[in-house]
């Protein structure tokens, strides 16, 4: 069986915690897109683990697979694996041979392009980790894949063309000096580094044909959880373009990015992860955005700082047009609503129920950023709820939530016509109300 976990908003919804929550029923956790630009935090055995690439299930002894839809920075991968081993874990990680590899010049180009965009006030706010440039090389059919690392002759030929082309862009288009990048455009240095990566991948038997590997695990009766990074409104096709990531976090890509067929993924559950309010890192419209004391309160209570970048996140009220769009684009069979505890003790909790633009009421996300930027939120207000003990609520169940918090949850369920499987009532894995396990 498969369960696909998808962020319903702009990332940072708490996907890793939900993956961890159902980890006991899972045998394999698969990342099907993205790279080391999407941090996730998992708490297990009283220990906190912050990961940006390795699938979160490995901290509970599950197999973690980075699918062909991912872009992999081997340096980050091995740093995270080694750090987990130093803490007494034995992570079982597999890499799709078809996944593309982030190389040093990708990171340099990422920073150069963002700097150029800053001059025209059109920067995206990337993490600078080379994700976009690597996907560009994938789509341009010139990138290096994990399988290429294992073929020394093919690797050298590919690098000869690729590095020369990228150096020309870095210097002639962006006006930077490649010689000042500590070897990021040095073919010999990159080739040697890639061969070292290949030796470790080969020695630890990490590379697999991911689709075949996962199909065999499912045939053997194993449960597979497919984990998207970022969120629906950051999807390259369905998100707030151009303020998006360079891949597809939406559920449809779970098949493409893992090598499993769409009927295999579609027969399983698709769970949308929702933060009880909204947060965003980087640029782009945000109609329900807050500032001042309320924003600061939510930011501090929710710890709204990027796992990877440490940047303060922008925060706002829950945006229902965004969630309706996500529910349609992904086909959620269930949802999880996290961080209900963060909103406790506010006198009033608001929701962006709809938008208004040019006198028209809009209930879903506009297709263009320009139209979205012109939207004003139509707010719906809820009475706030008192603080509660997360452990008590998690133990007693849904009925122990304050009545006003229940009304808030039931409003979201009704608007999306989707049941809430999980309610996050505190920061820990155990501080959750589980109403339905998608694997059962």
UniProtKB/Swiss-Prot annotation:
Q: What's the Enzyme Commission number for this chain?
A: 6.3.4.4
Q: Where is the active site?
A: 12 (proton acceptor), 40 (proton donor)
Q: What class of enzyme is it?
A: ligase
Q: Record's SUPFAM superfamilies?
A: P-loop containing nucleoside triphosphate hydrolases
Any one Gene Ontology biological process term?
A: 'de novo' AMP biosynthetic process
Pathway recorded for this protein: Purine metabolism; AMP biosynthesis via de novo pathway; AMP from IMP: step 1/2
Any Pfam family matching the protein: Adenylsucc_synt
This protein's assembly is summarised as:
Homodimer.
Supply the NCBIfam families for this chain. Answer: PRK01117.1, PRK13785.1, purA
What is this protein's function? Answer: Plays an important role in the de novo pathway of purine nucleotide biosynthesis. Catalyzes the first committed step in the biosynthesis of AMP from IMP.
Protein known as: Adenylosuccinate synthetase
What is the source species? Halobacterium salinarum (strain ATCC 700922 / JCM 11081 / NRC-1) (Halobacterium halobium)
